[in-house]
């Protein structure tokens, strides 16, 4: 009887400790470079090292080649307001559905069933290539700011941190590409809970004897480093520390 009682007490104590352990949620979303990042190889090992005994969990909603309008139903109205013509709007939108916003809410709800209270929520965003190539950059700043605001509202986390992966240097010959990089930095700098990740060193590779800056990052090391940087910048925001200003923590 004493053995059973002792075992019960130990199990109860373990459950209490587990319940008291802070849980930090990261939302990983975006297009191909976020899709290509396996959180198990770079992000989670780094997060576990940083947070120690605290628990880190994540949800991931990402798919290659997707413009921001796949996350935001208000994008069409924003695009018109910013002067995009109907032809360009149709070319970017392609009558596609807003298919990636609700899955974030659904996965968040599922996570809440396992962890009723998150110590922090951090939104990691790696997207923008499709909008830059399609000429959608005039609407991008307002669209991304609204997406962030909606997530903070719908997740009931006005304290949600954001970490934006700035577009790489792959397409800098295009004016729209450079404009997109600038927009992403403006959003980070204007948000008191914002940080950014630099990826300009993750896509350099040799082709036909020349070094090129590719759209997609080097495998596996580029995506491992990407995950580590997201974890480090998120950790700094969560702990009230100053994120790396150069985006390369």
What would you call each of these model-derived segments?
Residues 9-18:
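Hydrophobic h-region of N-terminal signal peptides that target proteins for export
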Residues 1-4:
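Positively charged n-region of N-terminal signal peptides that target proteins for export
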Residues 19-249:
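Cell-envelope and extracellular/periplasmic
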């Amino acid at each position: 009887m004493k053995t059973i009682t002792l075992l019960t007490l130990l199990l109860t104590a373990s459950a209490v400790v587990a319940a008291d352990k802070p849980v930090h949620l990261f939302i990983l979303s975006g297009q191909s470079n976020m899709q290509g990042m396996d959180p198990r190889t770079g992000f989670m090992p780094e997060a576990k090292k940083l947070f120690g005994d605290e628990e880190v969990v994540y949800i991931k909603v990402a798919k290659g080649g997707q413009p921001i309008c796949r996350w935001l139903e208000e994008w069409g109205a924003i695009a018109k307001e910013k002067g995009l013509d109907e032809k360009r709007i149709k070319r970017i939108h392609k009558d596609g559905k807003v298919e990636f916003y609700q899955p974030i809410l659904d996965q968040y709800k599922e996570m809440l069933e396992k962890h009723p209270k998150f110590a922090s929520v951090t939104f990691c965003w790696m997207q923008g290539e499709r909008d830059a190539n399609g000429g959608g950059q005039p609407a991008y700043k307002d669209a991304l700011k609204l997406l962030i605001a909606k997530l903070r509202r719908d997740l009931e986390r006005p304290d949600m941190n954001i970490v934006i992966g700035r577009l790489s240097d792959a397409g800098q010959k295009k004016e729209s590409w450079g404009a997109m990089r600038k927009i992403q930095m403006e959003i980070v700098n204007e948000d008191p809970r914002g940080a950014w990740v630099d990826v300009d060193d993750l896509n350099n590779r040799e082709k036909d004897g020349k070094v090129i800056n590719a759209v997609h990052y080097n495998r596996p090391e580029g995506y491992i480093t990407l995950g580590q940087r997201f974890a480090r910048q998120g950790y700094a925001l969560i702990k009230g520390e100053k994120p790396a200003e150069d985006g390369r923590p």
